[in-house]
Amino acid sequence: MKKATFITCLLAVLLVSNPIVVNAEVAGLIPCKDSAAFNKRMVNSVKKLQARLAKYDANTPPALALNKQIEKTKTRFATYGRAGLLCGTDGLPHLISDGRWSRAGDFVFPGLLFLYITGWIGWVGRGYLLSVAKTSKPTEKEIILDVPLAVKFMSSGFAWPLAAWQEFSSGQLIAPNDDITVSPR
């Protein structure tokens, strides 16, 4: 019985985790370097900056800043073209999340960074509220922040995954059922 359950679970995992390959042509996307709309966007962006540049004398601070911005714009579009991003008919890059590992870097790193930052904010806020709850006027300190105390929690929040795991494994993270109020229905 255990063997049959194991094989069934294994087959289910293999069927669910099998990525479906998406053709870019089917979705109407083409590589940005080959997209006429993408190249037109680059030309238009550079033309707008050059039109602004014409209003200033050469070697003035605004002219130098605009020249630098023109170079950055050209570099940005060239980087998008080399990165293998796919563009739609609007000329804008689109992210493909179809299960291919070659595209994972486009959204996995930003996603993990988002989760880390939101976890940091939540962990720091939780620590601040737990600390303030022990003071004589907790409601006042929730409305008017105690900045030195908040900064103390913010500076120690970078290690929140380790602190959360430590509190979870010691049983401090989860409140006992007696401490959780139930509202009347």
From Swiss-Prot:
Query: What is the protein's name according to its record?
Result: Photosystem I reaction center subunit III
Annotated membrane topology:
Multi-pass membrane protein
Superkingdom of the source? Answer: Eukaryota
Enumerate the subcellular locations listed in this protein's record, separating them with semicolons.
Plastid, Chloroplast thylakoid membrane
The residue range of the signal peptide is 1-24
Any keyword Transmembrane helix?
yes
What processes does the entry annotate via GO biological process terms? photosynthesis
- Cite the InterPro entries for this sequence: PSI_PsaF, PSI_PsaF_sf
Name the family: Belongs to the PsaF family.
Report TM segments: 104-124, 143-163
Functional summary from the UniProt entry: Probably participates in efficiency of electron transfer from plastocyanin to P700 (or cytochrome c553 in algae and cyanobacteria). This plastocyanin-docking protein contributes to the specific association of plastocyanin to PSI.
Q: Which cysteines are joined by disulfide bonds?
A: none
List the record's Gene Ontology CC terms alphabetically: chloroplast thylakoid membrane; photosystem I reaction center
Keywords attached to this Swiss-Prot or TrEMBL record, sorted alphabetically, are:
Chloroplast, Membrane, Photosynthesis, Photosystem I, Plastid, Signal, Thylakoid, Transmembrane, Transmembrane helix
